[in-house]
Regions:
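Glycine-rich "HGGG/HGxG" loop immediately N-terminal to the catalytic nucleophile
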Residues: 133-141
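Short, surface-exposed "cap/lid" segments of acyl-processing enzymes
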Residues: 59-122
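Glycine-rich nucleophile elbow surrounding the catalytic serine of serine-hydrolase chemistry
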Residues: 150, 175-181
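Gly/Ser-rich "nucleophile elbow"/oxyanion-hole loop immediately N-terminal to the catalytic nucleophile
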Residues: 73-82, 157-177
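Alpha/beta-hydrolase active-site loop
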Residues: 114, 142-163
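Substrate-binding cleft and catalytic face of glycoside hydrolase catalytic domains
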Residues: 94, 131-134
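Catalytic-loop region of hydrolases
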Residues: 1-78
Length: 181
């Protein structure tokens, strides 16, 4: 059907803005918390594919915010139950937009490659939020635990809503530094 999730999310990938415009959200920000606004292919991985997503979350004041995230989807078909999601709260990479995990190449550093590969082999969908204001317009919510927590939870919801992930509702959250408080 024309409005099936496959067509909707496929169109989002095909029509996501290119270059730095990817991180500039539409106004007003559509949908509900955890909805994917748009996505684009980022890289082929050992055992999966990485995408960049822009999704809806909420500011520390309860206002709608677009937040970017990196999502890795395992190759192949999941079990009939779907795939679990691991929402990973990484540490601070810096305060500028260019330091956001989705912009800096952080998710491809050698120190975490083995972990990503192992999780993909175990059929996990992995999502890592940039957090409010990191990579996207607005103030970076650094040390605002309530906003960061919402961003990490909404990233998990976005992974579940991202049709290519074929994720189920089983969600695991881990983090350290700013992503763990």
């Amino acid at each position: 059907p024309e409005n099936s999730p496959e067509n909707i999310f496929g169109a989002l990938i095909d029509t996501a803005p290119e270059g730095l415009d990817f991180w500039i959200p539409p106004d007003p920000i559509p949908g509900r918390n955890g909805d994917v606004i748009w996505a684009r292919h980022d890289a082929d991985l050992e055992g999966g594919t990485a995408y960049l997503i822009l999704y809806r979350s909420e500011s520390v004041c309860g206002e709608p915010r677009a937040v970017s995230a990196w999502i890795a989807v395992p190759d192949g078909e999941p079990s009939s139950l779907g795939r679990p999601v691991l929402s990973w709260g990484h540490g601070t990479r810096g305060a500028g937009d260019h330091c956001a995990a989705t912009r800096s190449g952080y998710m491809y550093q050698e120190e975490i490659n083995d972990l990503i590969t192992e999780l993909l082999a175990r059929d996990f969908v992995i999502v890592a939020s940039d957090y409010e204001g990191s990579g996207t317009p607005g103030m970076y919510a650094w040390s605002q635990s309530s906003a960061l927590g919402k961003n990490i939870l909404d990233a998990a919801r976005a992974a579940q809503n991202f049709n290519l992930a074929k994720a189920n509702k089983d969600t695991f959250i881990t983090g350290f530094s700013i992503g763990g408080h």
